[in-house]
Amino acid sequence: MVRDQAESLRLRVKKMQHETETKAIAVLSGKGGVGKSNVSLNFSLALRQRGKNVLLFDMDIGMGNIDILLGQTSSHTIIDIFRPNVTIHDIIKTGPENLSFIAGGTGLTDIFHMDEQKVQYFIEQLQLVSEQYDYIIFDMGAGMSEDRLQLLKAVDDIFIVTTPEPTALTDAYATMKYIHLADHQLPIYVLVNRARSDKEGIETLQRLKQVAKRFLGKELHALGYVPEDRTVSNAVIRQTPFLLFDPSAKASKAVIQMTERYLANEEHKEQMKRPFHFFAKLRQYFLER
């Protein structure tokens, strides 16, 4: 009896230690068409190349394209998890670099816009596999809703992808303001995609940081910028992630730098980071309302 209790305690401690190490990241944009999914995918692959176990979750339900960017046909999507005799193990697929991913689907407006029993089941299924991964990355759809906000409040970090265009910047600021007002402690990282020059990329990042600091009192973390690069469009046509299509391309090098910058920042704040309560927060926000 004592031995069983001791073993149970060890397992609980081990699980808590792992949960402290596992991180949930949500990647989003204020508007569609800024290359968010491409950034999510290639960032995930760059993490894999650095020895991190990653689950990339296509949450752009109804318009998901991670599987298309990978050139893979998925027999199951996230909506299948609610079908009889289908578990999360059935819908997780393996891509290049042994990247685990879950494809989006059609016919479901919002995965959390459903009854409590299904939400509970979804959370339990995701938690079932979470111990295998260092990072769970949610590639979110464009736009905001109250239910999506609850998911964002539960993750550890927010990545906002934008382009230098004024409309994209306006939407990016509106998105970060919405999130900041809901949880001012949530770390927000910004990435400028398709910068036409180094000057444009740097100035766009500086402008976003200054505006957030002045009007929100928010310190943004700059991930960097990805330059406009024909390699990206060529890779999309070939249905191959550009990081693998041409590792020496400017866009590929930028994603590598962005990944290394993020990991270095993670090491720097290792002593300060809060315990991982992602699943506890999901339950709190979705099941205890």
Task: Give the location of each predicted region.
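Extreme N-terminal, non-catalytic leader segments
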Residues: 1-31
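Walker A/P-loop NTP-binding active-site region of P-loop NTPases
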Residues: 24-88
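G-domain G4 guanine-recognition motif of GTPases
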Residues: 30, 163-164, 188-202, 225-232, ...
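P-loop/Walker-type NTP enzyme "switch/lid" segment
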Residues: 59-131, 236-238
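Conserved C-terminal guanine-recognition region of P-loop GTPase G domains, centered on the G4
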Residues: 123, 169-184
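Inter-motif core of Ras-like GTPase G domains
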Residues: 125-132, 145-167
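Beta-strand-loop-alpha "switch" segments that mediate conformational coupling across diverse proteins
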Residues: 216-243, 254-257
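NTP-binding/hydrolysis catalytic cores, primarily Walker-type P-loop NTPases
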Residues: 241-289
